[in-house]
């Protein structure tokens, strides 16, 4: 199928789907590989870091994340990759442990393009999920952008939008495409 339409918070019919708690994915599921491929393609086309299934109208507990490679600039100005891209297919994910310490950071969403706000999240999380091969996996004490993306995407699966996590709505700002930070799903 390829690119999918990303539902938007500002469309009342689409917001209804985005705020619905998703159903668990039943395994095995032969159509899952194509859906996951479509999700990655859609997420990359929208310059996102993560995408949850409800954002494309599928109310199942499925999300994809692609943390960009870490680059370092050399003294001569060239950039070199110091850590590769990290990709995850998260089927029926759940946060099993979370830090009591908060990390407040700028966050956006593909369902509200161009808008970002300061969102408090746990500084680290441990997440259990099923991978595309049907095996249970665990991401232990994820931090930084990965921790933020995991929490953001799992919120989508629970019908929670990032705007509901913002404590001070005055931090919700519109940015042009050029100045926008990386966007989670």
Curated annotation (Swiss-Prot):
One Pfam short name: Pep_deformylase
EC number from the UniProt entry: 3.5.1.88
Biological process according to GO: co-translational protein modification; translation
Reaction catalysis annotation: N-terminal N-formyl-L-methionyl-[peptide] + H2O = N-terminal L-methionyl-[peptide] + formate
Superkingdom of this protein's organism: Bacteria
Cofactor: Fe(2+)
Co-factor binding comment: Binds 1 Fe(2+) ion.
GO molecular function, one term: metal ion binding
Entry binding sites for Fe cation: 109, 152, 156
Active site: 153
Keywords, in A-Z order: Hydrolase, Iron, Metal-binding, Protein biosynthesis
Keyword Ion transport: no
Enzyme class, UniProt record, top EC level: hydrolase
Entry annotated with the keyword Protein biosynthesis: yes
Function: Removes the formyl group from the N-terminal Met of newly synthesized proteins. Requires at least a dipeptide for an efficient rate of reaction. N-terminal L-methionine is a prerequisite for activity but the enzyme has broad specificity at other positions.
Similarity remark: Belongs to the polypeptide deformylase family.
Protein name per its UniProtKB record: Peptide deformylase
Organism: Roseiflexus castenholzii (strain DSM 13941 / HLO8)
């Amino acid at each position: 199928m390829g690119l999918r339409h990303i539902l938007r918070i500002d469309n009342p019919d689409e917001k209804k789907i985005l705020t619905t708690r998703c159903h668990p994915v039943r395994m095995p599921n032969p159509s899952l590989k194509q859906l996951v491929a479509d999700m990655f393609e859609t997420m990359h086309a929208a310059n996102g870091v993560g995408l949850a299934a409800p954002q494309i109208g599928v109310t199942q507990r499925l999300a994809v994340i692609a943390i960009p490679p870490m680059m370092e600039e050399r003294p001569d100005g060239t950039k070199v990759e110091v850590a590769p891209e990290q990709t995850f297919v998260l089927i029926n994910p759940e946060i099993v442990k979370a830090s009591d310490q908060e990390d407040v950071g700028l966050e956006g969403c593909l369902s509200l393009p161009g808008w970002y706000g300061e969102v408090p999240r746990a500084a680290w999380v441990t997440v259990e999920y099923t991978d595309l091969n049907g095996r249970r996996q665990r991401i232990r004490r994820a931090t930084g952008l990965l921790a933020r993306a995991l929490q953001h995407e799992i919120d989508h699966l629970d019908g929670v939008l990032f705007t509901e996590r913002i404590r001070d709505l005055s931090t919700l700002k519109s940015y042009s495409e050029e100045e926008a930070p990386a966007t989670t799903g």
